Amino acid sequence: MFTFGWPLYLLINISGQKYPGWASHYNPWCAIYEKHQVWDVIVSDIGVFATLAGIGFASHMLGPITVLKYYFIPYLFVNFWLVLITYLQHTDPILPHYREGVWNFQRGAALTVDRDFGFLINHLHHHISDTHVAHHFFSTMPHYHAQEATRHIKKALGKHYHFDDTPIPLALWRSWKTCRFVEDEGDVVFWKN
């Protein structure tokens, strides 16, 4: 999940929402996208292939060990970090899942957990982890307003605002053990193990 999960999610939609046919973020005709987005995906795919060609060229010119050391290993670390943060923000036993009939934007935006990763990481990541609820409500808001927005969101949401200061390794363990699936029946469902 932490190293190859993100690339496999993009490539074959592993662990993603079920779609008819071949679900891939690289397939411009996939049900993930609207018809008017086909050319956007094609242009993006060209960029991905150009990047892969550049990596192949660098591997040929500099050697595969150099590319492994300076590109692939850091890439896997970034994937690990991205998936860890995203998983912990969106997967918690206290968060309900709303089915299509009862879901709305406000409920969906509130279905995330602000987590404290400590002063240094919060600062280096522009508080995306401890102000993530604000990001869901105002995704285009500059990061330097996120802490102020979070203070107001806490007041507005009251008991529906979710913050967890559990140490990250323990939060990961708890979510991994208790958040295995959601029931197939019901409009509002919670994680089960």
Residue spans of the language-model regions?
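Extended interaction regions within the primary functional domain
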Residues: 68, 79, 110-112, 116, ...
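C-terminal, well-structured subdomains that either form a transmembrane helix-short loop-helix hairpin
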Residues: 122-156
